[in-house]
Amino acid sequence: MSTLETTRAELGLVVVYLNKAEARDKICRAIQYGSKFLSDGQPGTAQNVDKNTSLARKVFRLFKFVNDLHALISPVPKGTPLPLVLLGKSKNALLSTFLFLDQIVWLGRTGIYKDKERAEILGRISLFCWMGSSVCTSLVEVGELGRLSASIKKLEKEIGNKDKHQNEQYRAKVEKSNERSLALIKAGMDVVVAFGLLQLAPKKVTPRVTGAFGFASSLISCYQLLPSHPKSKMV
């Protein structure tokens, strides 16, 4: 590829990435929690950025609860153990509830919904739902990693003395295992973030700790949404 073609391809990936509403939301999330880390809960510019970005992000999530509602009623892959099915459906139900209630919180903060006290209560309930969905996600990922580990070990025995890294199926399973490990780390971080937003342990999970974990999990989300890099042509 020429330099111009390479640059055009790279910019094309950026355009594809930024065209995703989810990607823009996660970039804003990184800004939000980065500002929370800098402010440490103290009044000032950083705290204003945190609050304003948090409100702006809610617009990205309007009607997003439908996605998890659809996943809730969709069939699961055959062979999935019942405990993982139940945990997965619980995650969908809790996340859908969080996103639905979050819309009422947005209406309250914009002044459309007048009962501010009820909006605040619903806001706390929504955060508990999000924390619950993150816990369910963590447990699902642990279970799926266990299944993948057993599958990889079985495949290693079948491959025998051959170079396992040359086996396409083996590489795919290892890549999937890495993806699930990253998802597990992110879900664990999100539990801490929810804990901090709910102020369940304000002395330990301070706004700065919440901001640090939220910023890190946002970067992971941004990475997970990256489009696949086009393979360069061999001459």
From Swiss-Prot:
Location(s) in or outside the cell: Peroxisome membrane
GO CC annotations on file: extracellular region; peroxisomal membrane; peroxisome; plasmodesma
Pfam families: PEX11
Membrane topology of this protein: Multi-pass membrane protein
InterPro entries attached to this UniProt entry: PEX11 (IPR008733)
Induction: Up-regulated during senescence.
Keyword Cell division found: no
Main location, first listed in the record: membrane
Tissue specificity field: Expressed in roots and developing siliques.
Highest taxon listed in the record's lineage: Eukaryota
Regions of this protein lying in the Lumenal compartment: 109-206
Cytoplasmic side: 1-91, 227-235
Keyword tags: Membrane, Peroxisome, Peroxisome biogenesis, Transmembrane, Transmembrane helix
GO biological process, one term: peroxisome organization
Gene Ontology MF terms in the entry: identical protein binding
Transmembrane segments: 92-108, 207-226
Subunit organization: Homooligomer. Interacts with ARC5 and FIS1B on peroxisomes.
Role played: Involved in peroxisomal proliferation. Promotes peroxisomal duplication, aggregation or elongation without fission.
Further details from the record: Can complement the yeast pex11 null mutant.
Family label: Belongs to the peroxin-11 family.
Name of the featured protein: Peroxisomal membrane protein 11C
